[in-house]
């Protein structure tokens, strides 16, 4: 079977997306990465996977504060901290004074400053309070909300990948701009 066989290409794209967006050891290859870069549909598929796995905590017979902790720990164990690192970089860039070159330099700096720590802390607080608000709505409703949130987030990524333009060369430039509106549909 070659990559021109539809099922193989789809499988490669989904494996590439899982390898990129999660810490699940799928054993991806360069062919998987390349298939993923051409397949915006693979992003929401991973949203269903992540939402389904992390949303499972809502079926645990625990008190709401423990549920919130289990959700956050499960989310970061499953997806890693790459997204949190990017969020901290964004917070540092927003806090810096200067021109676009100075802002880009802060984005590339590996140290986290006050702006990054503040944005990350506020974001974690908002997510924790959001999850806490699910207490009492029922396990299945909470589960469906988490799945919908993850799928929606991945659809947002697909939208940016298909319609956005990369600001500079980097990892994002390998995804953004390589697809078009037909890929999103």
Predicted ranges, named:
Residues 155-184:
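Solvent-exposed interhelical
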Residues 36-54, 93-136, 140, 144-148, ...:
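Multi-pass membrane catalytic core of lipid/isoprenoid biosynthesis enzymes
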Residues 30-38, 106-111, 169-176:
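Short juxtamembrane and helix-loop transition motifs at transmembrane-helix boundaries
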Residues 18, 24-27, 95-98, 159-166:
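Hydrophobic, membrane-facing alpha-helical anchors
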Residues 1-72, 76:
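Topogenic membrane-insertion module of multi-pass membrane proteins
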Residues 17-21, 73-83, 147-163:
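Transmembrane alpha-helical segments that form the membrane-embedded catalytic/substrate-channel core
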Residues 51-59, 76, 80-81, 85, ...:
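Transmembrane alpha-helical segments of multi-pass membrane transport proteins and ion-pumping complexes
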């Amino acid at each position: 079977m070659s990559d021109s066989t539809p099922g193989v290409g789809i499988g490669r794209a989904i494996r590439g997306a899982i390898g990129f967006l999660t810490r699940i050891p799928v054993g991806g290859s360069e062919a998987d990465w390349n298939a993923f870069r051409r397949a915006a549909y693979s992003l929401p598929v991973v949203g269903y996977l992540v939402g389904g796995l992390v949303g499972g905590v809502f079926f645990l017979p625990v008190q709401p504060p423990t549920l919130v902790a289990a959700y956050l720990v499960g989310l970061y164990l499953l997806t890693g901290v790459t997204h949190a690192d990017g969020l901290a970089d964004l917070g540092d860039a927003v806090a810096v004074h200067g021109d676009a070159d100075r802002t880009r330099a802060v984005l590339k700096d590996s140290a986290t400053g006050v702006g990054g720590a503040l944005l990350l802390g506020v974001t974690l607080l908002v997510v924790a309070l959001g999850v806490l608000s699910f207490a009492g709505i029922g396990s299945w409703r909470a589960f469906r909300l988490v799945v919908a949130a993850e799928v929606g987030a991945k659809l947002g990524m697909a939208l940016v990948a298909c319609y956005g333009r990369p600001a500079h060369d980097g990892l994002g430039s390998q995804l953004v701009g390589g697809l078009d509106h037909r890929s999103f549909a």
